[in-house]
A protein has these predicted regions:
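Conserved SAM-binding loop and adjacent beta-strand
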Residues: 1-6
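S-adenosylmethionine/decaboxylated-SAM
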Residues: 8, 17-190
Length: 190
């Protein structure tokens, strides 16, 4: 509930302040969070980045090797394979505004330059989160937000590590607000 309530407030802020830029979700899974973003912004494109087939073995290996995530966790969530892009698109109120970017991120980054007003990152693992921050944060318009899921999830230590490593790369701290949802979502403002 808290995550969706926070999303509602962020959407109000973006609308009230006329923040330009598109929408994106990195780590779409079955599209429930994306669906809400799409419904609230009929005039914006929504970029949907996902393998639509579960975690990539390269990212799993990095998390296990660095003790960010235990192998049993991947078994418990069945690698989030229970999805496909057609299932996601059918949930959308404005499906024509959706741009599916199926495959391994960051290989699926759009060729054209896109700026964003709202991005959800919910891919659980260190490398795609770090790559997501590298791509999205510089392209966020002032007044825009990134919602990063699982920031305080004890089983997913790579999420917080990716944020810290990104801050080291750019040489400064991000404007971050943790929210008290069950997985410890982090809101990053620009």
């Amino acid at each position: 509930y808290c995550r969706y309530a926070t999303l509602e407030l962020i959407i109000e802020e973006i609308k009230e302040n006329n923040i330009e830029g598109e929408l994106a979700e990195l780590g779409v899974f079955r599209g429930d969070f994306s669906k809400y973003m799409n419904k609230e912004f009929p005039e914006k494109k929504l970029y949907l980045f996902d393998t639509f087939g579960g975690f990539d073995a390269r990212d799993v290996d990095v998390d296990i090797k660095n003790n960010f995530t235990k192998g049993q966790w991947f078994e418990a969530v069945e690698n989030f394979k229970n999805t496909d892009e057609n299932l996601v698109i059918r949930k959308m109120k404005y499906p024509d505004n959706c741009v599916v970017r199926k495959g391994y991120f960051p290989d699926t980054i759009p060729e054209n330059e896109v700026t964003y007003s709202l991005v959800s990152i919910d891919c659980d693992l260190y490398m795609p989160i770090l790559e997501g921050l590298r791509y999205f944060y510089p392209r966020m318009n002032v007044g825009g937000y990134i919602m990063l899921h699982d920031y305080n999830t004890p089983e997913l230590k790579g999420v917080k590590k990716a944020v810290k490593d990104y801050e080291c790369e750019i040489g400064r701290r991000l404007v971050k607000v943790p929210i008290s949802d069950s997985c410890g979502t982090l809101v990053i403002g620009k």
